[in-house]
């Protein structure tokens, strides 16, 4: 799938297979995104989905209300369609 990442330094579109976490694909493409635990248990890598769908069933940090607003943990999110994500959204969670 095509994953568009809107970062503070600009917009990048990368290819991300449906079995690869978005954070991992971004790193392979040379992008520097924030992360900490890489296990879906903190909010360092949080982003916000602007369009498209992801599967983040491996995460354990976000509550239903946060996910309902479109927040996503990129370290444990797989794309299930072409998706656009606003990165660096940890502060917006709180």
Swiss-Prot record:
An example Gene Ontology biological process: electron transport chain
A cellular-component GO term for this protein: chloroplast
One GO molecular-function entry: 2 iron, 2 sulfur cluster binding
Entry-annotated residues carrying Phosphoserine: 9
Keyword Transferase appears in the UniProt entry: no
Cofactor info, note text: Binds 1 [2Fe-2S] cluster.
Keyword Transmembrane set for record: no
InterPro entries tied to this protein: 2Fe-2S_ferredoxin-like_sf, 2Fe-2S_ferredoxin-type, 2Fe2S_fd_BS, Beta-grasp_dom_sf, Fd_pln
Keywords: 2Fe-2S, Chloroplast, Electron transport, Iron, Iron-sulfur, Metal-binding, Phosphoprotein, Plastid, Transport
Name of the molecule in the record: Ferredoxin
Organism: Scenedesmus fuscus
Lineage: Eukaryota, Viridiplantae, Chlorophyta, core chlorophytes, Chlorophyceae
């Amino acid at each position: 799938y095509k994953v568009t990442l809107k970062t503070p330094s600009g917009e990048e579109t990368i290819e991300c297979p449906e079995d690869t976490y978005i954070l991992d694909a971004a790193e392979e493409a040379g992008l520097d995104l924030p992360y900490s635990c890489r296990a879906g248990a903190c909010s360092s890598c949080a982003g916000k989905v602007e369009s498209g769908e992801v599967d983040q069933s491996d995460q354990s940090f976000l509550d239903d209300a946060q996910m309902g607003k479109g927040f996503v943990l990129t370290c444990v999110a797989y794309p299930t369609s072409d998706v656009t994500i606003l990165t660096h959204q940890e502060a917006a969670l709180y």
